[in-house]
Regions:
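Conserved glycine-rich cofactor-binding loop
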Residues: 9-10
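Short alpha-helical oligomerization interface
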Residues: 89-101
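Active-site helix of classical SDR
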Residues: 111, 147
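Active-site loop immediately N-terminal to the catalytic Tyr-X3-Lys motif
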Residues: 136-142
Length: 153
């Protein structure tokens, strides 16, 4: 199976990558922290196709998804695990902006790209992993909760 995971370098995304890497899958991973991409590449005997991109940078994420799609020719499964958030009790916009750019703007852009790839292929599966914070809210991290509610809905 050909799989692309955005946010595969830490947390749930990394665990999913490790599970799929131990099976007979071809995996493209997208993340912004190059040293962590390199660690996965080395640890798994060059199995992943690592691509550096920051999901909040639409040009980078478009290039990364297109490059992996071209390399793989077909994507069976896309998993969205990326996300960020900050403690910000005062709702300072400068603190919230990266959360909005990552969890709403970049996330929506990537979802849209995968949707069109799957539409073109007439097949494909999309998994979006988000947070229970989108259901109950976090008063100290308001943008994080709001962006996760957006993803859930």
């Amino acid at each position: 199976m050909n799989i692309v995971i955005i946010g595969a370098i830490s947390g749930i995304g990394k665990s999913l990558f490790e599970k799929y890497a131990n099976e007979n899958n071809r995996i493209g991973i997208i993340g912004r922290r190059v040293h962590l991409l390199d660690e996965l590449y080395q640890k798994y005997s060059s199995k992943p196709l690592p691509t550096k991109a920051d999901i909040s940078n639409l040009e980078e994420i478009e290039q990364a998804i297109n490059a992996l799609h071209k390399e793989m020719e077909y994507i069976d499964l896309a998993i969205m695990c990326s996300g960020t958030g900050n403690i910000n009790a005062t709702l300072d916009y400068d603190v919230e902006r990266p959360t909005i750019d990552t969890n709403i703007v970049g996330w929506t852009f990537a979802i849209d790209m995968f949707y069109h790839i799957f539409e073109q292929q007439s097949n494909g599966h999309l998994v979006a992993i988000t947070s229970a914070s989108g259901l109950r809210g976090e008063p100290m991290a308001p943008a994080y909760s709001a962006t996760k509610a957006y993803q859930i809905n």
